[in-house]
């Protein structure tokens, strides 16, 4: 699994003009991609890493502060641009594989006590955020 984690002051996701998920105070936006070989174990490991990642102000984590997390599925994180000018999406898992793993990631965050908002899996979403810092990290879990 791959995640792009951004420290934000606020963020929201809209689908067809309707807000489906938002955080209104400082926290994290996590864009999550899934590849073919990913497992529930990896989803849980990524959730632990994100929840305990000390990138909030004061070198604190969401686990320590209760800061909210907005999770957005994003298959394009596995886009391959090594050949030509049109990305290949072959490394991205199909929806039937990816959606349950995104759900497992979110469920593990919530099980750990995180306040989690989400986008809509597979939807055409508009993600608005105020990146704080900016602080942006790419996490890969094998």
From Swiss-Prot:
Positions of short motif Gly-cisPro motif, important for rejection of L-amino acids: 133-134
GO CC terms of this entry: cytoplasm
EC number(s) recorded for this UniProt protein: 3.1.1.96
UniProt-listed Pfam families: Tyr_Deacylase
Task of the protein: An aminoacyl-tRNA editing enzyme that deacylates mischarged D-aminoacyl-tRNAs. Also deacylates mischarged glycyl-tRNA(Ala), protecting cells against glycine mischarging by AlaRS. Acts via tRNA-based rather than protein-based catalysis; rejects L-amino acids rather than detecting D-amino acids in the active site. By recycling D-aminoacyl-tRNA to D-amino acids and free tRNA molecules, this enzyme counteracts the toxicity associated with the formation of D-aminoacyl-tRNA entities in vivo and helps enforce protein L-homochirality.
The protein's assembly and partners: Homodimer.
Domain-level remarks: A Gly-cisPro motif from one monomer fits into the active site of the other monomer to allow specific chiral rejection of L-amino acids.
Name this protein carries in UniProt: D-aminoacyl-tRNA deacylase
Originating species: Acidothermus cellulolyticus (strain ATCC 43068 / DSM 8971 / 11B)
């Amino acid at each position: 699994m791959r995640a792009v984690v951004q420290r934000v002051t606020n963020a929201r996701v809209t689908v067809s003009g309707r807000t489906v998920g938002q955080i209104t105070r400082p926290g994290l936006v996590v864009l999550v991609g899934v590849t073919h070989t990913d497992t529930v174990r990896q989803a849980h490991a990524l959730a632990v890493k994100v929840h305990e990642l000390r990138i909030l102000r004061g070198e604190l984590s969401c686990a320590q502060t209760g800061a909210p997390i907005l999770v957005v599925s994003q298959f394009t994180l596995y886009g391959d641009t090594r050949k030509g000018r049109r990305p290949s999406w072959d490394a991205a898992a199909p929806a039937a594989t990816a959606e349950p793993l995104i759900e497992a990631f979110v469920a593990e965050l919530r099980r750990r006590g995180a306040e989690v908002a989400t986008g809509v899996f597979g939807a055409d979403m508009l993600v608005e955020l105020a990146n704080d810092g900016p602080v942006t990290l790419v996490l890969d879990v094998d």
